[in-house]
Regions:
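Extracytoplasmic/periplasmic substrate-recognition and gating elements
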Residues: 14, 54-126
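Short helix-initiation/N-cap motifs at beta->coil->alpha
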Residues: 20-34
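Pocket-flanking alpha-helical
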Residues: 28-31, 48-54
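Beta->alpha turn/N-cap motifs
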Residues: 26, 43-48, 67, 85-87
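Short, charged, surface-exposed loops that flank catalytic or proteolytic processing sites
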Residues: 176-190
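Long, aromatic- and glycine/proline-rich binding clefts that accommodate carbohydrate-like moieties
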Residues: 65, 121-176
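Glycine-centered hinge/linker elements that transmit conformational signals in sensory
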Residues: 1-22
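Alpha-to-beta junction loops
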Residues: 35-43, 60
Length: 191
């Protein structure tokens, strides 16, 4: 907890949106990085299209760094990057009709088994497929960086399973802290 808060405090101190961190605009973050006004933008490989739209040099050097937590250089979190499935596709069997479920399954099969769907998934969405049968390699520097780190064993995964009120409860506590309306002790108590 202490290491996480120290890292968050550092990011808040040296941030283009320091004056209003809760008002930071996603598109502005992409522009700031693409134009070279900031060195870091915490995000994932899916942000590549946003960077290109913001004017990033498609041949530029972009990649990921560890999300540093503390001063222990031997800590895996300080030497690797965290990567896990950020997008999940699910079929609703409660509120959707049988026809809608069939269409959803057909779409998933298109993404997983169809050559055009596989290619689109990787090249147009800038995502890295979980399905091992997809032969397409990332074309953008962010996807390439993750693929290289995966091959080198330099990433760790996290399984994000949280209670249904996670965002409303923990998110609210984090927003209070980030906006300067609570202390570190208040944040710890809320979490």
């Amino acid at each position: 907890f202490n290491q996480f808060v120290a890292t968050m405090d550092l990011m808040l101190e040296y941030n283009f949106a320091k004056a209003d961190p809760l008002g930071a605009d996603y598109d502005q973050g992409a522009l700031e990085l693409a134009c070279g006004n900031v060195a870091f933008w915490p995000n994932g490989c899916w942000a590549w299209p946003n960077l290109v739209e913001g004017g990033a040099d498609v041949n530029g050097e972009f990649g990921f760094i560890s999300f540093v937590l503390g001063d222990d250089t031997s800590d895996f979190a300080n030497n690797m990057i965290q990567a896990s499935a950020s997008k999940q596709i699910m079929v609703d069997k409660v509120q959707s009709t049988a026809e809608q479920q069939a269409a959803a399954k057909e779409f998933i099969n298109y993404l997983v088994y169809d050559a055009n769907g596989q290619k689109m998934f990787v090249e147009e969405t800038a995502l890295i497929p979980a399905a091992k049968n997809n032969p397409n390699a990332p074309l953008d520097p962010l996807g390439k960086d993750i693929a290289e780190r995966t091959a080198a064993g330099l990433l760790y995964t996290s399984c994000f399973i949280a209670p249904s009120d996670h965002w409303s409860v923990i998110g609210a506590a984090m927003q209070k802290y980030i906006s300067g309306n609570s202390s570190k002790a208040d944040l710890a108590s809320a979490l």
